[in-house]
Amino acid sequence: MPLNKKVLAIVLAGGEGNRLMPLTADRAKPAVPFAGSYRLIDFAISNLVNSRYLQIVVLTQYKSHSLDRHISEAWRMSTQLGNYVASVPAQQRVGKSWFLGSANAIYQSLNLIHDANPDIVVVVGADHVYRMDFAQMVEQHVHSGAKATVAAVRQPLNMADQFGVIEVDQNDPQKIAAFVEKPASTPGLAADPSQFLASMGNYVFDADALVAALHVDAERLDTKHDMGGDIIPYFVNQGEAGVYDFTLNEIPGSTERDRTYWRDVGTIDSFYDAHMDLISPLPVFNLYNSEWPIYTRQSISPPAKFVRGLNNTVGTALDSIVSSGVVISGGVVEGSVLSNDVYVATSSRVIDSVLMDKVQVGEGAVINRAIIDKNVKVPAGAAIGLDPELDRARGFKVTDSGITVLSKYQEVPEPGEHERQLAAKNLHLVPNAVKAAADQYPEVRESVDKVARTHAAAAAAEASPGARVS
């Protein structure tokens, strides 16, 4: 721990995540499953634990049952050594209101800071995908003399309305000159006009300065009690806010390719794209870095199994993540992420999709560019993600980019003849993962083209039984 400072970490995990609906209809945003085996909150807590910060409180509020359960099962620390990951719900400790914002959540939980008596408080969000050594940020914070430090990452200019925007002091690149939360627009960086400096939602504070700022905020009438919207501007106005450049952070086992990976997965499209990042031949974010592991609750399900189906077709998975307990029985999975205990039946196809725990895919069904939440049963011959109007008519969400989303336990009607024919015609779709590989790696284009030709030939053979597939 740098400079022998005592550090308390606070994870803000009370968000509703409206932009991730319907995945957040029954759970808090940080509890949304990710990458087959994890929950979103696992990335924040793993980064803190790997940074050797082992006194962690998680502030929860919205539909927190599954989040609380996950924390209690996955994050058991050695309390005899004074270490803990504690889930703390809104308790109305100050007045009769629940948490009114991220700053108010900490204000209502000031007893946690008083009890721990830290020198430094690290405050992090719970819904981003990245690796970060917070000890390096704390070290800069202490040496800089700032009272508050904000972690910053470069983002495309058209995303300025989604983040807190940081302007650095021209005479001191580690000092914040201005901070605006989610402006309609902002100038680009001098070094790269196509980008701006965005807040990552991760902060380091001198503990006494944070407590004082929270008391000031609590007395104000013109506040939303928000860390980014109110507390950070308070420190900026005092001339006491610093910035930490995320590109300086060095993670053991990382490469230049993945070292500065950071994704806000707060929308359906960004959540989907982050999954597709993982299954590419050379993923931008490497889940397999054992020197900075991402921890989670370990499944008790048996290993995945690939077996022949009833008609002797071979169960296969290509360019995919397949988790414990998955059984692919004569079906084909390509460019997809399958969580625990998914079942894929004979002659079915799962393409460019994300399937969460215990989804069952019936015989001959086709799923394309979809996110399907837990415990959904897809009947035989069903077509999902092939016809947006059909999907909407059945109550599924379809994004503007064409991602179809099914909520937990959502019922999928038995398909009619038109839908069965639609599924049958698309049993040999070429996955986006195959197309992307051809664009990303010219040296494998020939083999990728061969895969595409094989898919096309197989489709033609089914349409004309006398045709030959080579």
Curated annotation (Swiss-Prot):
GO MF annotations, alphabetized: ATP binding; glucose-1-phosphate adenylyltransferase activity
Positions of alpha-D-glucose 1-phosphate binding: G164, E181, K182, S199
Pfam families per UniProt: Hexapep_GlmU, NTP_transferase
Broad enzyme group: transferase
CDD domains cross-referenced by the UniProt entry: ADP_Glucose_PP, LbH_G1P_AT_C
Biological or metabolic pathway of the protein: Glycan biosynthesis; glycogen biosynthesis
GO biological processes: glycogen biosynthetic process
Entry keyword annotation includes Zinc: no
EC number, UniProt record: 2.7.7.27
Transmembrane segments: none
InterPro entries reported in the protein's UniProt record: ADP-Glc_PPase (IPR011831), ADP_Glu_pyroP_CS (IPR005836), GlgC_bac (IPR023049), GlmU/GlgC-like_hexapep (IPR056818), NTP_transferase_dom (IPR005835), Nucleotide-diphossugar_trans (IPR029044), Trimer_LpxA-like_sf (IPR011004)
Keywords: ATP-binding, Carbohydrate metabolism, Glycogen biosynthesis, Glycogen metabolism, Nucleotide-binding, Nucleotidyltransferase, Transferase
Catalytically driven reaction(s): alpha-D-glucose 1-phosphate + ATP + H(+) = ADP-alpha-D-glucose + diphosphate
Self-association and partners: Homotetramer.
Family from the record: Belongs to the bacterial/plant glucose-1-phosphate adenylyltransferase family.
Role: Involved in the biosynthesis of ADP-glucose, a building block required for the elongation reactions to produce glycogen. Catalyzes the reaction between ATP and alpha-D-glucose 1-phosphate (G1P) to produce pyrophosphate and ADP-Glc.
The protein's name: Glucose-1-phosphate adenylyltransferase
Organism listed in the record: Pseudarthrobacter chlorophenolicus (strain ATCC 700700 / DSM 12829 / CIP 107037 / JCM 12360 / KCTC 9906 / NCIMB 13794 / A6) (Arthrobacter chlorophenolicus)
Protein's gene: glgC
